[in-house]
């Protein structure tokens, strides 16, 4: 985070209004994405982003976020404080305009802010519109100002309620339960985002507190190392190829800046995150394209120049040179152009050349100054290249075999007769025994079954060539029909529901995790598109007289037993606890786990790539201490049958 401050005043005259606030309550999803959990947490980010923009402008050093006892949120900063003077055009204070007019803010003209993630005031007004109550307090001019709102409308004028030392803004809001499905905030979700913001803005101190349930906890996120510390944090459960993090920060006269931190590990997967003005550009864009192009060219040029790659050797591909790379690419610029309203892909064309040039110069300099580390990096890239070539040959062999064999689907697959993928689903079933029951009990029109023998390969510890030689993985790839890795084509997917059906025990959970690791690492669009599900088979079957009940957890079973004993008197109760799917006959399996009307399916989703990468690295990687720590910390959330 640069130390330079934006010149120019920040008062009500700089607040410009684009349109009124009425549409927000009618169509909240257009402004915050959804009225579910992600939208609820988005409210916090909108207010925090305004404070971060004060930090980017050089005026804010501390931000405090508190989840209050009643699940309201307070965000406080030590920035300049929102403008309290009257705007002549609207005869309202700057504070009230910011909170009651949509698209009102001080970021259009460039005087109040040079670089910002959003439009100052868009966030505040949207949050106000979607809150049943909001209180704003401002420290400015030696006075403490206060104003209260409800559902986007001011309930009191802006008034001075006392004296104040210093400057800053404080916002407390209560999300409207009439709009949101649930108004309970998740500490871990906020923790992840605020830690990320602190990494991206070195020196900024962000505090997160939780005052609920009498359990007053507080965490401080403050990283003087910025992106370098971010990369070390992401790699803390991996083994780095070189101890130091490669880092550079380059600026241009027009306020465009790129900062990059990168480090290679012994992992087989890439984790490169990109940001534009602190916004996580999940789909990348011109900054990420420039970075990737430069890394590929620099590694190839260095390898050729130093005879590590022979003239006759093919060039290393982008995938080869990024295997095991953890990187952060963060750009800051005026008026960024995004390719969608949700700002997940940067479209500003001139950024590509700037990032590519900066990366080429600085990464080349690092390799030339660190020949030992350079050789280790290029050795890893060349191993990746050899594995990729072996995997390509394995895929070609499979393709040729499939082209010659009209019955190329796996022999174990019991396919469905429906040919519309949107109406079709496939069950991946643990073991031949349960697979047999599933084949008998299924709806043959729409449900396919593929039994899996034992535990599939742990892809976290294997390269592509070994993965593609695994029989169980080859069977899945062939059955799905959409290819894998670079050949993946979602339009060719044969089933729009891929359902993992494993035993409700430790082994079943392990197999489920192995499958999810494979899908996340090598068929990512399946998970991102919401095509992957986990079936939830029952844990208990309870009989009382002629009545049969199935329950799916111990608390549910306890409730059922209490109810039966209350209503059924002395009538005998028989309980069977299922250890595996194979203990159910095909009628029971259909009735409890496969029947469209009765079953419970859990849709697997990935909200955050770095968090998912971390969990799979911990659970399926080589390091035991972080895995043990993760299991101990999360055991209370798990349902485990030992």
Language-model features: locations:
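GHKL-family ATPase ATP-binding module
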Residues: 1-14, 21, 43-45, 53-55, ...
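Conserved short strand/loop->alpha-helix "switch" segment adjacent to the catalytic nucleotide/phosphoryl-transfer site
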Residues: 26-45
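Residues immediately C-terminal
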Residues: 53-54, 81-82, 506-507
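Helical (often loop-to-helix) elements that flank the catalytic cores of nucleotide-handling enzymes
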Residues: 88, 339-352, 550-556, 560
